[in-house]
Swiss-Prot record:
This is Tryptophan synthase beta chain. The modification N6-(pyridoxal phosphate)lysine is found at residue 88. One of its GO terms (molecular function) is tryptophan synthase activity. It catalyses: (1S,2R)-1-C-(indol-3-yl)glycerol 3-phosphate + L-serine = D-glyceraldehyde 3-phosphate + L-tryptophan + H2O. The lineage of its organism: Bacteria, Pseudomonadati, Pseudomonadota, Gammaproteobacteria, Alteromonadales. The beta subunit is responsible for the synthesis of L-tryptophan from indole and L-serine. Pathway: Amino-acid biosynthesis; L-tryptophan biosynthesis; L-tryptophan from chorismate: step 5/5. Its cofactor is pyridoxal 5'-phosphate. Pfam families: PALP. Tetramer of two alpha and two beta chains. Its EC number is 4.2.1.20. It comes from Shewanella baltica (strain OS195). GO terms for cellular component: cytoplasm. Belongs to the TrpB family.
Length: 396
């Protein structure tokens, strides 16, 4: 069997821990990706879709009222303005084009908050591909607007009732389906995790976020930011923001995991800082595990961060100290969700609100002129009912 063309590991993390039946499919995907990256026609079509369909470049907005400290500027990279409502659209268009190039007729995907499912459904509608989306039954209930959007665009949404009925279970079902259908179907993984080559493919198709941010910052401020901040579930929006800054030592990279009800409780989703290394979802990565090594259920108010593991490149950036990973609780994210709406007239996704919460906290503690950029990874329309129910419950 042919050797791999790309390194499947980031330090000790990553790899291709899958049933033997899937190894040829992953190698075929890697070869197709490497060839596509060297094909000017493929790159031109991808760039055209990002610009004329998705609406890139997205704005870099200087907040007027959010920063609690006059010495600190907080910019927002506005992935919420992308068609589909979140950063997910970037890499989904790339993978869907890649699937067509490989002659696949069908797309299988998993989704948590429903944003990846919506992005996959719109890409499949655009490119004429059959679409099947696995979604935890709990997430189907808490993300009904996105479920309707997916079905409206022709996707088949399959609720998953096994396990905790959330994202990890949807991932397992999608992978199981692909094991039996990879000759005709492409598994369009939604985050920078899973078996090689997915973490690399997703990073490269999301890299545009950081590339644009760097260019826009130099135009606006004449210098790079002091820190870029992004929420981390599986980690695709964060790695998209970080990728172009990894080799810029003056820029701090900060990922924000969901602390849920508190890091000192079992109700969180912060495997990077509070997990143990294990094998899950085809990769070696930090995992939320109990003493017996069983995967613990993660928890977050935000469906898109409710994942018990994290992408292998984030694990490596954490291990080497190049990136710093913090956390924000449900309550802090809820406060930031409302604060951004009140201060700037922008309703963020609950996922992105975790990053906003940490940026405001960091700004408060800064003692010198500082520029922070937050990746506003998605808009909050999908979360208004969840937040409304919680706030009404709190008021009663």
């Amino acid at each position: 069997m042919s050797k791999l063309k790309l390194n499947p590991y980031f330090g000790e993390y990553g790899g291709m821990y899958v049933p033997q039946i899937l190894v040829p499919a992953l190698k075929q995907l890697e070869t197709a990706f490497v060839e596509a990256q060297e094909d000017d026609d493929f790159k031109a079509e991808f760039t055209d879709l990002l610009k004329n369909y998705a609406g890139r470049p997205t704005a870099l907005t200087l907040t007027r009222n959010l920063s609690p400290n006059p010495m600190v500027k907080i910019y927002l990279k506005r992935e919420d303005l992308l068609h589909g409502g979140a950063h997910k659209t970037n890499q989904v268009l790339g993978q869907a084009l890649l699937a067509k190039r490989m002659g696949k007729k069908e797309i299988i995907a998993e989704t948590g908050a429903g944003q990846h499912g919506v992005a996959t459904a719109l890409a499949c509608a655009l490119l004429g591909l059959k679409c099947k989306v696995y979604m935890g039954a709990k997430d189907v209930a808490r993300q009904s607007p996105n479920v309707f959007r997916m079905r409206l665009m022709g996707a088949e949404v399959i609720p998953v009732t096994s396990g905790s009925a959330t994202l990890k279970d949807a991932c397992n079902e999608a992978m199981r389906d692909w094991s039996g259908s990879y000759e005709k179907a492409h598994y369009l993984l939604g985050t920078a995790a899973g078996p090689h080559p997915f973490p690399t493919i997703v990073r490269e198709f999301q890299r545009i976020i950081g590339e644009e941010t760097k260019k826009q910052m130099l135009e606006r401020e004449g210098r790079l930011p002091d820190a870029v901040i992004a929420c981390v579930g599986g980690g695709s929006n964060a790695i998209g923001m970080f990728a172009d800054f990894i080799d810029e030592p003056s820029v701090e990279l900060i990922g924000v995991e969901p602390a849920g009800k508190g890091i000192d409780t079992p109700m969180h989703g912060a495997p990077l800082k509070h997990g143990k290394t294990g094998i899950f979802f085809g990769m070696k990565a930090p995992l939320m595990q109990d003493r017996e090594g069983q995967i613990e259920e993660s928890y977050s108010i935000s469906a898109g961060l409710d994942f018990p593991s994290v992408g292998p490149q984030h694990a490596h950036l954490n291990a080497t100290g190049r990136a710093r990973y913090e956390s924000a609780t449900d309550d802090e994210a809820l406060e930031a969700f409302q604060q951004l709406a009140r201060c700037e007239g922008i309703i963020p996704a609950l996922e992105s609100a975790h990053a906003i919460a940490y940026a405001v906290k960091m700004a408060r503690e800064c003692t010198k002129e500082t520029i922070l950029v937050v990746n506003l990874s998605g808009r909050g329309d999908k979360d208004i009912f969840t937040v409304s129910d919680i706030l009404n419950g709190k008021e009663e």
